[in-house]
Amino acid sequence: MAPELKTEVNIISKVIQGDLESLPPQVREFIESNAKLCQPESIHICDGSEEENKKILDIMVEQGMIKKLSKYENCWLALTNPRDVARIESKTVIITQEQRDTIPIPKTGSSQLGRWMSEEDFEKAFNTRFPGCMQGRTMYVIPFSMGPIGSPLAKIGIELTDSPYVVASMRMMTRMGTAALKALGNGEFVKCLHSVGCPLPLKEPLINNWPCNPELTLIAHLPDRREIISFGSGYGGNSLLGKKCFALRIASRIAKEEGWLAEHMLILGITNPEGEKKYFAAAFPSACGKTNLAMMNPSRPGWKIECVGDDIAWMKFDELGNLRAINPENGFFGVAPGTSIKTNPNAIKTIFKNTIFTNVAETSDGGVYWEGIDEPLPPGVTLTSWKNKDWTPDNGEPCAHPNSRFCTPASQCPIMDPAWESPEGVPIEGIIFGGRRPAGVPLVYEAFNWQHGVFIGAAMRSEATAAAEHKGKIIMHDPFAMRPFFGYNFGKYLAHWLSMAHRPAAKLPRIFHVNWFRKDSQGKFLWPGYGENSRVLEWMFNRIQGKASAKSTAIGYIPADTALNLKGLEDINLTELFNISKEFWEKEVEEIKQYFEGQVNADLPYEIERELLALEMRIKQL
């Protein structure tokens, strides 16, 4: 007979899988107190097995939450409520006693570097949402490891959720189940609580059989208590709490305390024709090609690129002073639109088995489709859009949601690095920052030193497709590509990065900035991008080896005249690609100054202020 969990309100939650008695006391207490609060009908402790996964998928099919894609092996399609399609920054908060622990106090207006909520306001919000929120549903207990199980850099979390979609996705995105629980023992874990906020019986029918509660959505982080509490959204970024919530917001705070870095960065290995290998980490804002770079097929003969991770890096200096990085994830949660054989052949080779697609279009022959897939539809095959309606190009709107996703196991990617799961991590020798800058910013430049490199990360800006009320594109500040993900005050984060230079024996990686997106006066890209970006990586590789020459400019080192290998490329206008215009950079300096003064204000480290002044002086002398 399954053990029953008695609660004060006499709601009984049956344990339908697993054994509460055998769990570590602090895990059991976490489950019991939340079961008492949320009142699920049953409790399922996940073991991560293949058999369990089949059961979870069957439950979702039965609920109409996913459907099988007959064209591929073990692939599924979920269509969400159109109001639950992305991360929601306005509803993502961090709770600390003091506002300044979370964000710098801006000079005027509100902070763009995070959202703080007071403990009192959070308590009220929590109490209006969670009591009874899982009635009629199963509470799944998901023990998971961020990072290879047993790695000294890994951390354990436990997520309680009432969404089977979260269970199936977390099984791909993390190392989930019994092994994670064993690794935890009686240790510390990050407590993650998630509910879609739709107790049964429903008050109103679901849209697309997708439970969510957009009015009451809230994603809250309590770094002092190592807790994440998410309500009302089933979408990945808000519900797969190991991803941005834990691996960036909570982890960046843990990293500050423990002396390491948790960053929004891909990790790749690059090997030259002589068989020498180096690892790079790279931070780009969303939609600037992180996944494409991490999985690139280099155009340069004899060069090889392998992928360690496409989104998040945890990096710590070892005893020898090497900066060691792990990918804390176990899968890819990638944006589907724009993914094609041309833009990312290795992603295409990864995603057509054991994958959950969300909000892409479906073909009448049981396949998937999206903008930029670059595959003509076979004759007679029709499309159903992500809104579950018949679709033709005349509809005037995209067939797949612009933020539609694939969730797929990393182990299926044909170019995973042999060391991608190595417990000690891979040694990072170069860090790359980048953004989408149509004007003014050269293809590549190198920082003069670590401090200058930290300044470059802090000053990152990138073109964003603005919300509907703006016409055209705007250039947004996105420092370190972490703007939506800082777990604590950005000024203190900069100080933490700067402090790495004072570590005894630290071998500091070189820092670079790239811009694949510069355009000419006709609006055409000046650089072909994709596999040709390997030429830029080749220059960086050779710089680290002390082999490639560079010339010093006002903004950093750029490749000397013949240092960038352009063999086999036609019509590359190097002059325009590397032009550093005084007028442009004067405006850029002014923009950065306003941003630092307005947003980071009193918390801006003086070293960063000094770097800005030095840049201003160098620009004046152009």
UniProtKB/Swiss-Prot annotation:
Keywords: Cytoplasm, Decarboxylase, Gluconeogenesis, GTP-binding, Kinase, Lyase, Manganese, Metal-binding, Nucleotide-binding, Phosphoprotein, Transferase. Residues 457-487 are annotated as: Omega-loop. GO terms for cellular component: cytosol; endoplasmic reticulum; mitochondrion. Gene3D superfamilies: 3.90.228.20, Phosphoenolpyruvate Carboxykinase, domain 1 (3.40.449.10), Phosphoenolpyruvate Carboxykinase, domain 2 (2.170.8.10). It catalyses: oxaloacetate + GTP = phosphoenolpyruvate + GDP + CO2; L-seryl-[protein] + GTP = O-phospho-L-seryl-[protein] + GDP + H(+). InterPro entries: PEP_carboxykin_GTP_CS, PEP_carboxykinase_C, PEP_carboxykinase_GTP, PEP_carboxykinase_GTP_C, PEP_carboxykinase_GTP_N, PEP_carboxykinase_N. The keyword Metal-binding applies. One of its GO terms (molecular function) is phosphoenolpyruvate carboxykinase (GTP) activity. Its main location: cytoplasm. Pfam families: PEPCK_GTP, PEPCK_N. Phosphoenolpyruvate carboxykinase activity is regulated by glucose levels. Phosphorylation at Ser-90 reduces the binding affinity to oxaloacetate and converts the enzyme into an atypical protein kinase using GTP as donor. Its EC number is 4.1.1.32, 2.7.11.-. The keyword Manganese applies. CDD domains: PEPCK_GTP. In eukaryotes there are two isozymes: a cytoplasmic one and a mitochondrial one. Monomer. Belongs to the phosphoenolpyruvate carboxykinase [GTP] family. This is Phosphoenolpyruvate carboxykinase, cytosolic [GTP]. It comes from Gallus gallus. The gene is PCK1.
